[in-house]
Amino acid sequence: MAFQVKIHQIRAFVEVARQGSIRGASRMLNMSQPALSKSIQELEEGLAAQLFFRRSKGVTLTDAGESFYQHASLILEELRAAQEDIRQRQGQLAGQINIGMGASISRSLMPTVISRFHQQHPQVKVRIMEGQLVSMINELRQGELDFTINTYYQGPYDHEFTFEKLLEKQFAIFCRPGHPAIGARSIKQLLDYSWTMPTPHGSYYKHLSELLDDQAQTPQVGVVCETFSACISLVAKSDFLSILPEEMGCDPLHGQGLVMLPVSEILPKATYYLIQRRDSRQTPLTASLITQFRRECGYLQS
C-alpha cells in the first residue's frame, strides 16, 4: 500500500523548516520534541527521502526538503483558506487576509482602503507585507500571500500569476531642499551627482534603467536600497538624488524634505497590477477587499 502523508506530518515538517530546529518547532506546535522527531522520521521513511540535514545548531532543508516544502506550505495555506471560506459563507465574517503592497501603494492607496475595510470587518486580521514583487514571489507561490498590488516588468512569472492592471503613477526626480542640483533642466545635467535607487530587480526600476541606458542617460547609482523608506531618507537628508513617484512631493511624512526637479524629459509611468496565483480561489472577504482596491484605483484614475 502506498504511503499516505498525514496532515499532522505536514504541519510538523513545515514548522520545523520555518523554525530551523526541532526545539523551536515543538514550542510553536505545543508538542514534545520526541513526538515531533518521530513525526518527521516517519515522514522521511514514508517518502524514502531525507528532508533535513541535522546539525548541532539546528536543521536545514535538503534539496528534496526544499521541493517538498513548496508543496507542503501551500497545502496548509490552501487548507486554512478553505476553512475560512466555509466559515465566511456561513456568515462568520472573521479570519485573516495576507496581502503584499508596493511601497508607493502603501503610502497612497492602502490607508484609505484598509481603514474602511477594517471598519466594516473589525474581526478580520489583515497582514501587510511591503516591498517589490521580487521580494514576495515565494510567499505568493506558497499561498502565504493572497494577492499583491505591485509593478511588474517582463519576467518569468506570466505562467504562474494573473496580472490585472489597476492604475498608473507618474515618477519624477527628487532632491532635498537647497540641493545644488535645483535649477537643472535635463537628466544629463544631473549625471555627475550621487544617486540612490530602490533595487531594480523585475520592476519599474528595471524598466527605467533599461530605458535610460538606451538614451545614454544612465545615472551612476552608488547606493541601492532594499526599502523605499531608506531611499527617501537618503534623498531628504543628504545630497543623493532619486527617482520616486510624483506624489512623494505631497506626502505628509516626507513632502517637506523633498523637492521635485522639473527636467524636460518625461519619465515612464509605472503600471501597478493586482497579482494573484493563477490557481488561487478567493474567500468572500478577500474578494470584497480586492473590490475595494479596484474602486479606489478607479477614483484615483478618474
List PLM regions with ranges.
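Short helix-boundary/capping micro-motifs
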Residues: 14-32
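A short LG(V/I)-centered, amphipathic sequence patch enriched
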Residues: 44-63
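Central regulatory/effector-binding core of bacterial HTH transcription factors
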Residues: 94-155, 225
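A late-sequence structural motif
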Residues: 109, 174, 181-182, 259-302
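Hydrophobic hinge/microswitch elements
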Residues: 132-145, 151, 201-259
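Beta-alpha-beta core module
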Residues: 157-164, 169, 229-278
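Flexible hinge/capping segments at coil-to-helix
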Residues: 161-195
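Secondary-structure junction motif
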Residues: 181-182, 187, 193-215, 282-291, ...
